[in-house]
């Protein structure tokens, strides 16, 4: 306490000098105090409120009349209680302004009657604000309750109020000069007492109307108390008059922020930002960086209750912190935490952050308090965002939580649908899997009764196929696969009476049927139109993919008959090992070989020996031996597709189409005039126009020019 008071007295040199000048008028002050007590006793008969407040003042004055040393402790304790009363008295500020107007008018009428009317002002002010008068009465009574020995205590308490005056002088210097020249001659000793009270709690002024009436009161008291103006402190009265004028004129004053609380929230934020700048300057001048951070938490109690500006709470908290020491800040922290938890309002917290962003020293404390408020709000209510900065994040987090709460509601539906679909599939699978996978497993394990027969001649008949398989066993059914137009697709299915007969018929794979080596494979029993899917498992693909023991041979004499070529290849490669299959594709237009062959071996050893015969001589021709690949099989399949494309064109054209669909031997087919139809899908003329027009659109115009 002593150190802080000394520092404040040294720094505020002008105000300390003015205080020393005012010491000579202490005796007059005590006389004024007696008059105040008389005036209070007279005013008790007017209103009920006027009776209650003077009784409190007398009780406090009785407590303060012991020796000067006790005055310090009592004032510090009362100031600490005042800081608590300020928190409780804040909700009453908006109710009191109208009631304060009537006593103010009475004061102006009484002040013009006699010289001691200005002494009634400190007693009437508490009538308008009973809960707020504690700080003002304590400051005045502590000054008036002691003699010359009390002058040692005055610099301790008065510098709390003058600390704010240098800021007002620095911020609004021009206005001070004008107000000094106008009001320096019109100050009185009673006004100095009143000014000490006002500066001790300048933020308690309720409205602009009351302030204007107080200025009128000061004018009336100035005109009536010219005889007592010699005892005034010349520096305090101009400052008070300046503050009163600034409260009605500028937005930087402390009382103006109270009037703006009644006006609009936007003006509060602007004025609180300006006042917070001036407060931060005063805090830096007071050389107490630790205390301003603690009182900075006071706006939480006031803003959450009423949304007042930050400047008011900082002024009152700075004064109470300098007077009461370390005890009020602890109580303030408790008040701030309790008020923050009980009354969290999003608007007030938004105003707090708008003012906190403009003062650097208050950021750390306010942010920490905001975080506490946020945590408690989210735990208690979880309804509104705490501040502007966290509003977007809170909204996004709430949206995310909503999305997450929606997703669990949606995903079970998806899971239920998936389960229902799965149940449908599981319900349908047994009926479908009975002919599918179990049949295939049975076909592979126990053997199927049906064989897939591929590479059939297009002019083959069912009787011919039946005779071909008579040696294997009894044929129950023969099904040829056809296109939609009824044309034969070149393969079919043969069903035997027993699985043993079907297995025995597999041995006929590669044998010629009407000049073509027949492809045989166990088929899945699906019905008449299974060859489309059975084609994937057809014999001419399967050996090259499944066994991997197939070689591709070319370079032999193609002028020989198919049977002669087969026999010569079997003799040539017979020394390599067991040959399981020999396939020699042929041109179905002429019946001659296409110049290539495929040969399957039983094991990999035989296959490796067959590779060694690459480049060997067979009938004067050098053989080319290589591993069979899917591409040649696709070529053969392409031959089938060529036939399909052209078969749609009409009669007899399927051979030409297949010839054209092969490896380029189809010039004869095109020479017949309808071989180009394999590239189209409908007849002679239209496919010809498409084939001539699509590759070269320019030739079309050229033909038109020639015509």
Swiss-Prot record:
Record's Pfam families?
A: RRM_1
Q: Any idea where the RRM domain is?
A: 449-525, 549-630
Q: Bias category Acidic residues: which stretches?
A: 75-85, 108-120, 144-153, 219-232, 248-263, 271-287, 312-326, 355-370, 395-406
Q: Where is the composition biased (Polar residues)?
A: 420-429
Indicate, by first and last residue, each region the UniProt record lists as having compositional bias (Low complexity).
158-170, 336-347, 376-394
Q: Out of the domains of life, which is the source?
A: Eukaryota
Q: Which GO terms describe its cellular component?
A: nucleolus
Q: Which UniProt keywords apply?
A: Nucleus, Repeat, RNA-binding, rRNA processing
GO terms for biological process, alphabetical: eukaryotic translation initiation factor 4F complex assembly; formation of translation preinitiation complex; rRNA processing
Q: Which PANTHER family match?
A: EUKARYOTIC TRANSLATION INITIATION FACTOR 4B/4H, NUCLEAR RNA-BINDING PROTEIN SART-3
Sum up the protein's function in the record's words.
Answer: Involved in pre-rRNA processing and ribosome assembly.
Listed name of the protein: Nucleolin 2
Question: Which source organism?
Answer: Oryza sativa subsp. japonica
